[in-house]
């Protein structure tokens, strides 16, 4: 069941759901807007001959932070990692779904490639997979609305929420745009 604005506010008031910093003006009828943080991870296209999900490739990306008051420019065809300004903490019976903002999609900005689902129990800044599919550069301003978080109530609390030892939660507590850790649980057959 998708939570309404009333339910979102009740979960935050009960301190079961946390988005810090919280701004009540960001609550929408069935979602809450999230804003863009100021850190980005850009890909180093000359460090490796290819990307291998089975390998740890520490120099695949570089952390970039625009100067105060300046935007990050995302060029056509470029893919970078960003993150939400908000630290998001979900209880064991709520899952999240990150969706892009329609107004930004109409400009050619994709907010996430595939990883729009947030497990119950997750706590951290949500990493964004930002792509420019337009023919012109797009300026990304720190603090701008970048997506909307929809919240879904589970039929019962998760037995092993994200962050529990049984799950192997590679991104719990992440701060800023976090590079892939796919190598940690990659299985070669």
From Swiss-Prot:
Gene3D superfamilies, per the entry: 2.70.40.10
Biased composition, class Polar residues, residue ranges: 171-189
Site (Important for bifunctional activity): 116-117
GO molecular function list: dCTP deaminase (dUMP-forming) activity; dCTP deaminase activity; nucleotide binding
Gene: dcd
Active-site annotation: 129 (proton donor/acceptor)
Protein name (Swiss-Prot/TrEMBL): dCTP deaminase, dUMP-forming
Pathway: Pyrimidine metabolism; dUMP biosynthesis; dUMP from dCTP: step 1/1
GO biological process, one term: nucleobase-containing small molecule interconversion
Subunit structure: Homotrimer.
Reactions catalysed according to its record: dCTP + 2 H2O = dUMP + NH4(+) + diphosphate
Entry-linked Pfam families: DCD (PF22769)
EC number(s) given by UniProt: 3.5.4.30
Region (Disordered): 166-189
Tree of life domain: Bacteria
Presence of the UniProt keyword Plastid in the record: no
NCBIfam families assigned to the protein according to its UniProt record, in alphabetical order: dCTP_deam (TIGR02274)
């Amino acid at each position: 069941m998708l939570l309404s604005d009333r339910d979102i506010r009740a979960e935050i008031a009960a301190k079961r759901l946390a988005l810090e910093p919280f701004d009540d003006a960001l609550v929408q009828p069935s979602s809450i807007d999230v804003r863009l943080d100021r850190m980005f991870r850009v890909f180093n296209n000359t460090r490796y001959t290819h990307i291998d999900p089975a390998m740890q490739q520490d120099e695949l990306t570089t952390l970039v932070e625009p100067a105060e008051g300046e935007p990050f420019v995302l060029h056509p065809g470029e893919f970078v990692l960003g993150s939400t300004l908000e630290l998001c903490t979900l209880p064991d019976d709520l899952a999240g779904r990150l969706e892009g903002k329609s107004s930004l999609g109409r400009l050619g900005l994709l907010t996430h490639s595939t990883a729009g689902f947030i497990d119950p129990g997750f706590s951290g800044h949500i990493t964004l997979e930002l792509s420019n599919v337009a023919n012109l550069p797009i300026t990304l301003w720190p603090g701008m609305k970048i997506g909307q978080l929809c919240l879904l109530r589970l039929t019962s609390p998760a037995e092993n929420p994200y962050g529990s030892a049984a799950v192997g939660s590679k991104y719990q507590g992440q701060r800023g745009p976090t590079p892939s850790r796919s190598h940690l649980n990659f299985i070669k057959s």
